[in-house]
Structures are given as C-alpha cells and as structure tokens.
Amino acid sequence: MTISYTYDVATESYFGFFKVLFRWKGSVWKLIHRELFMWLVLYYTVLAIYRTLDEERKKIFRSNIEHFINFEPSILTFMLSFFVTTIVQRWNNVFTNMGFIENAAYAVSSFMKNGEDVRRAQRTVIRYLVASQILVMRSISIKALRRFPNYESIVTAGFLTKEESTIIQNTDLSYDSSCVPIRWAIQVLRHQYRSGNFFSHSVYRATWKEVSDFETHLSRVRKVDWVPIPLAYPQVIFFAVRLYFVICAFAKQYFDLDDDDARYVIHYYFPIVTVFQFICLMGWLKVAEALLNPLGEDDDDFEVNFLIDSNIYTGMLIIETSKPPPLKPDLFEDRNFGPIYPNNITDQSVGQALCGSVENIKLAGKDASIEVKKNGENNPPA
C-alpha cells in the first residue's frame, strides 16, 4: 500500500517532525531494522572474540585492521547519490505513465452525440481501455497478477466478455496482448465516426489521440519493466555498501580503553557514530531498493488494483454524467456577493490578495503627468 503522511506535515510544527519520524509502515526503521540487528550481532561478536585473545594475538589482530581504520564512506555517498537519482527518475516515469482514464473519458463523453447506441459505445471504449491496462499490469505487477491470474478472472470481474476473452486467447500474443482491446476501442470510435455520431472530424481526431496517448503511457511502463537498469550497477552498489559495514564491524571497534580515552567510553560499549552512518547509508540504499520496482508488494509500492478500480468506475461515471443540469443564475452575478467562510475559520491569509512584489509601490499619482523623452543614439537605454 501507499503510506500517506501528507496530513502530518500539512502545517510545520515541532511535533510534526516526531509524527513522521516514529511512523513504522514504510519507514526507514522497518527497512533497516533486521540488517542493523545483524550488524550489531557481528560487531559485538568481533568484540567478544577479541577479548578472548592473548596480548600477542590482540596486537596481530589490531595490526591487520589498521589499514581500514581511516577508510571513509565518501565514495559510497557519491555512488549512492547517482544511483538513487537514477532510480527516482525511473520511479517518476512509471508513476506518470501508469494510465489515468480521465482525459480519454472526457474526450469520449464530450465529443459525441447523445443516444443509447452512442452511450453503449462510449462505455465499451472505457471498458476496453481498462482491459488493456489490466493485460499490461498483470504482466509487470505481482499485485495485478494475483488479482487476475487468468483470463477467466478478468471475465468474472466484468472487464471482458467470454467471447472477447476467447478472441484474445486465440490471437498470437507472444509480444503484446494489450494491443487487442486498444484496437477494438479505436474500431468502435471509427464506426461511430462513420455513423455520424461525432460532431466533427477534428474532435474525432482529438478523441482518437487521447485513446492513443493512453496506450502510449501503458507501453512506456511496460518498456521500463522490460529493460531494467543494467544488473552490474545495482550489484556494485548493494555489494559496496554492505561490504563497507562488514569492514566497519572490525575497523570501528574501541578494543582497549585507556585513562586518556575516557571521553570515548560510550563508544566502547555502543558504536553510536557507526550506527548513525548505518542508518543513513543503509537507509538510503533501502530506499533505492524499494523504488527499484514500484509495482511490487512493498509498503510504498503503487496501488495498481486501486488504479484499475478507479479508472473503470471514474470512466463510467464520466460517461453517465456527461449531460449537465439546466442552466440557472448563480449567486456570483451579484457583484456584492463576497467570499463566504465558516465562522470557525481563522486563516490569516483571508482577505490578503497575492500580488506582485512591487505592485504596491507608488512612484507617481494616478493622474500625474510624466515627462518623457525620446531615446536617441547618444542616450542609450540604461
């Protein structure tokens, strides 16, 4: 599911930070808590083993890890920044191309004449578009595949008839199954155009373009799934970050605490700085892992099934409510009818119009005469 925290940060406040920080679902704590626990076990295991060694072996142990003590994660930060940027761009590309039905539904419902046959054709076009979306999503999203494991489930849900399902299954769909319902939708529109049910050729073309754009968006999402980021790139990042913290389990130890090192006593028992690094770097990496495939089943992955339901019901609603109510006078015809707010509204911005930064600066009176002159060659503009 998508975890919403927008209301918690609607107004900046001191406690708003804690509301977001102590969330569990979709949080960085949920992403890293297992690996942080495993790392702490490794850290204290190394410390316990060191305590069992004699002095000579302790010296050998310390000499072997001295090479890693000053190793800093700056290169990891550099690598992670590029990797996460790439992942977020792909995530945004998937989100903007998942297929939202509104534009196509508005075009289909607005540019055609009224009539029962036209209404049925409009509803059929919407159903075909959503059926095409289902065929795409069930090939790239495990959530959609669990809901529609076969064509019979699509028929049962009402997105296809048995006859339509049979035709699709009997078609060679080795490369793309979603093209068939899209083609049917275009054919329905074409038949309605030939029957004279479109107001003009230009609006028919506009409707056809919206249907085509819907298919284009679905095609882009499918291609993102087909061609992921080259495997070597995430392998390097995943391996490098985890290897760094394995090294830290040895190199960031405070093995012996002298009297002069009393200020480090807390680090002797708990590696605060290294744990902070772990939360930041490993959390950053886990964010990238979660966004790498936003159509999976993580807490913050996209709600594919909700989008399918929203598209079919919203599209049908737009078709059924395309006829507006009778036109009547509105209250705003009275120029003295001002903005109305409930009595309990205390918004400080009420009555404060947004305006340009120098709009209220008066350099001359309303009717003042301004002396002007022509800009000549010897008097260039400033």
UniProtKB/Swiss-Prot annotation:
Going by the UniProt record, its keywords in alphabetical order are: Membrane, Repeat, Transmembrane, Transmembrane helix
Q: Which GO terms describe its cellular component?
A: membrane
Tell me the compartments it is located in. Membrane
The answer to whether the entry has keyword Transmembrane is yes
Give the Gene Ontology MF terms in alphabetical order: chloride channel activity
Answer yes or no on keyword Lipid biosynthesis.
Answer: no
The UniProt entry, under InterPro entries, shows: Bestrophin (IPR000615), Bestrophin-like (IPR021134)
Q: What is this protein called?
A: Bestrophin-6
Family stated for the protein in its record = Belongs to the anion channel-forming bestrophin (TC 1.A.46) family. Calcium-sensitive chloride channel subfamily.
The record gives the membrane topology as: Multi-pass membrane protein
Where, by residue number, does the polypeptide cross the bilayer?
29-49, 68-88, 231-251, 265-285
| Chief location | membrane
Locate the coiled-coil region(s) and give their ranges. none
